[in-house]
């Protein structure tokens, strides 16, 4: 599924992105900066996120590769005023080599992996 229109605008202007996975102990949420995602670039159907720690996220993805991202910004006009959100669901895995990892490491020397999200559903909110 493509990230386009208002959803793309929200993702490009968001300050932070929440990342939710689920493992044997239940749901787990971490976050990353929107600038990190935008520095890598946003292809139409996937999102690449630099990974510093996120060890529990990685363990959860090995058990269940489903993921949900949530972002928002007041820079995009919402239905009732300033502010629009976006929920992105899909599947993900950690890459420690290859093109996506190389792109992440070239910009973020501290990154130990690239979290690559294959987008399956995009919903705007607010």
Sequence positions of predicted segments:
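Binding-site signature for planar aromatic cofactors or substrates
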Residues: 1-126
